[in-house]
Amino acid sequence: MKPNNNQKVRVIAFYLPQFHPTPENDRWWGKGFTEWTNVGKAKPLFKGHYQPRVPADLGYYDLRLPETRQAQADMAREYGIEGFCYWHYWFGNGKQLLQRPFNEVLNSGKPDFPFCLAWANHSWEDKQFNKDGGHKMLMEQLYPGDEDYLSLIHISEPTRHAQIS
């Protein structure tokens, strides 16, 4: 197979939606928990390992704020990013987590920036934070079938979704 040198490589950044509080995270990890909580707790593990790293530019942003999402898209565009790939937590049977930032982008049309989804296709357990070696199921990933597909039909309408051609 001969490579097609006319194809352009496109850079699409993963967009992780953990940077805003949710009732589930409040219940499981404590009031106000976001991924920033873990960033702030980071400890150096070896000589020269600078931790915690304080976020530059946008600081400890909150994804509930439209101006944060706009600033992220502006910055991404400035540095050659062509779209965001939102990490999508769909657990089946109508249950989603961390959907607010993406839903607000979809409903408002802002920021006007191409997007796609990546299904975070796994259960959530507390094992990564549990120090006793056990684990507890927080949210089980289910596969009801057609519902998985049907839950996404509404996002195929916008013209902003990143297209691969």
Where are the regions a protein language model picked out?
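N-terminal regions that are enriched for targeting/export leaders
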Residues: 3-71
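Active-site beta-loop-alpha junctions enriched in small/polar residues
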Residues: 16-18, 89, 118-124
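The substrate-binding groove and active-site-proximal loops of carbohydrate-active enzymes
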Residues: 52-65, 82-93, 135-149
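Short secondary-structure boundary/capping segments
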Residues: 28-30, 100-102, 131-134
